[in-house]
Swiss-Prot record:
Its EC number is 2.7.4.23. GO terms for molecular function: ATP binding; ribose 1,5-bisphosphate phosphokinase activity. It comes from the Bacteria. This is Ribose 1,5-bisphosphate phosphokinase PhnN. The gene is phnN. Keywords: ATP-binding, Nucleotide-binding, Transferase. The keyword Glycoprotein does not apply. It catalyses: alpha-D-ribose 1,5-bisphosphate + ATP = 5-phospho-alpha-D-ribose 1-diphosphate + ADP. SUPFAM superfamilies: P-loop containing nucleoside triphosphate hydrolases (SSF52540). It is an enzyme of class 2 (transferase). InterPro entries: GK/Ca_channel_bsu, Guanylate_kin-like_dom, P-loop_NTPase, PhnN. Coiled coil: none annotated. GO terms for biological process: 5-phosphoribose 1-diphosphate biosynthetic process; organic phosphonate metabolic process. It comes from Psychromonas ingrahamii (strain DSM 17664 / CCUG 51855 / 37). Belongs to the ribose 1,5-bisphosphokinase family.
Amino acid sequence: MPNSIIKKYPSKGKLFYVIGASGVGKDSLLHYARQRLANESLVFAHRYITRPVELKGENHIQLTKEEFNNRLQRGCFKFNWHSHELDYGIGVEVDRWLMQGSNVVINGSRGYLNTAVALHPGLVPVLIQVDSNLLHERLIKRGRETLEQIEKRIQRAQAFVGLTSPNMQIIENNSELSVAGEQLVSLLRNQAVKIL
């Protein structure tokens, strides 16, 4: 599948690229931060995914495979990747928000990190981590995957142990949601470009 058509725009805002293994609590942490930072100069971008929308979990825009490919061919995605038999995209609207001075938070992919950094060198990677035993427990509890799929996700998580990138920020999510949630809120507030 071809990569998205990329146009580089001057960025006044900062791009935060939140990543972590399935089950580390990214969706919960992003939801927590979105509520706490609702009145600040941060925009939480939605993802376009070839997965049905669920009542609990990520608030994304569901696309069929055909719709996704159509948007990909038309250059509608700033970032796009394929993982766990699904296609994911971040829309080019993110560039407009950044150009207008908004700070933008996106739910990214560890496997796409190097490409994202190459396309947007100033982005801030935020890695959410959790102990491996807790990760397995959370994947079972959320009930979204089969046991075989859970095992594949655990193996993929192990493949990314030691992931590094310039300016990488790390948040451990091994206790109450509010602990890691407040760390994420503080990080976003402190590193966001202040709009005068």
